């Protein structure tokens, strides 16, 4: 997970954020709104609302490891 975190921190453009989001979803990482519970918090991505993956979020989101 350290590698993913470093890659995320290194990416700053919206395009990379959306691509990273798609990759993380494939790896079983879920996106939750900032106001929700944050179990197993990995890292906090920059605010970015480009692309369909972020269309429903108006603020920064947290990524958590899916256990379902």
From Swiss-Prot:
Its recorded name reads: Alpha-conotoxin VxXXIVA
Extract the coiled-coil ranges from the record.
none
The subcellular localization recorded is: Secreted
Q: Note the superkingdom of the native organism.
A: Eukaryota
Keywords, in A-Z order? Acetylcholine receptor inhibiting toxin, Disulfide bond, Neurotoxin, Postsynaptic neurotoxin, Secreted, Signal, Toxin
Tissue specificity note:
Expressed by the venom duct.
Q: Any extra detail in the entry?
A: The 3 disulfide isomers are poorly structured in aqueous solution. The toxin (with connectivity C1-C2, C3-C4) does not have inhibitory effect on alpha-2-beta-4/CHRNA2-CHRNB4, alpha-3-beta-2/CHRNA3-CHRNB2, alpha-3-beta-4/CHRNA3-CHRNB4, alpha-4-beta-2/CHRNA4-CHRNB2, alpha-4-beta-4/CHRNA4-CHRNB4 and alpha-7/CHRNA7. The toxin (with connectivity C1-C4, C2-C3) does not have inhibitory effect on alpha-9-alpha-10/CHRNA9-CHRNA10.
Q: What does this protein do?
A: Alpha-conotoxins act on postsynaptic membranes, they bind to the nicotinic acetylcholine receptors (nAChR) and thus inhibit them. The toxin with a disulfide connectivity C1-C2, C3-C4 (shown in the sequence annotation) block the rat nicotinic acetylcholine receptor (AChR) alpha-9-alpha-10/CHRNA9-CHRNA10 with an IC(50) of 1.2 uM, whereas the one with C1-C3, C2-C4 shows a lower activity with an IC(50) of 3.9 uM.
**Primary site of residence:** secreted
